[in-house]
Amino acid sequence: MKLRKIAAAALLAAGALTAAPASAFVLGPTSPGKWGPPAFGTGATISYSFMATGTSCGQEFAGCTITALADFMPAGYLGAVTSALAAWSSVANLTFNLVADDGLPFNVGTSGELRFGGHPFDGPFNTLAHGFFPPVNGATAAGDMHYDTDDQWKVGFGGNPNAFDIFQVTAHEIGHALGLGHTAVANSLMNPFYTEAFSGPQADDIAGMQFIYGPPQTQGVPEPATAALLGLACAALGAFGRRRRAAALPVA
């Protein structure tokens, strides 16, 4: 199987990567490095939205423009993204609420705390996506996720060997958006290599997320109403490629 990078993109922020005590999971570089109350082990309710095609992402690179997920991903992408959110809320004290995106540029809009969109990265088979760490992380970029529009995407494992499963990549990037860094644990979702050997968060990933937000209290991802989805553009800031790499975005 070809390996692809999963990149964690983060605005320059104070704080070094820190491994949580007695575990292999790695926390992100921001402080407090989570949503909701700043104390580790406390839950959070987090909003998310889908950026529309044409939304500016010029703070990433000159001329950058977002493409909605609906405009480059296959049918079923929305269910895959929702399932990735649910995979995390089922193992930690997290609730996700869909909101309408305000259409403002990347790192300016204040609609969804997690904003999904896509744009070209570095051609196919390299970095697949990137995700921005939680606050404090430079204005409103925190939590945003972008997919590489030059790569091919699919729903489910198998099939096209040159395409990448939306759920698996999204779940990895959400991990970054919620506060986890890359781990050296081989069979972990937060390892920087794309794989179809397992699906979703594994033991080390779950331990890390529960360290940040505590164990689950309720199921946290209600199905979005059909009417609420009409007209919403899909975008994502995930980071899978041959290897997930950390890329820094300078603060303007």
Residue ranges of predicted features:
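C-terminal membrane-anchoring or membrane-association module
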Residues: 238-252
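A short, hydrophobic C-terminal helix/tail in secreted or cell-surface proteins
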Residues: 222-241
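Residue-level micro-sites within transmembrane alpha helices that shape
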Residues: 4, 175, 222, 241-242
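Zinc-dependent metalloendopeptidases
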Residues: 20-225
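Bacterial N-terminal signal peptides
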Residues: 9-16
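Bacterial N-terminal signal peptides that target proteins for export
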Residues: 1-8
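Generic alpha-helical secondary-structure signal
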Residues: 9, 212, 230-232
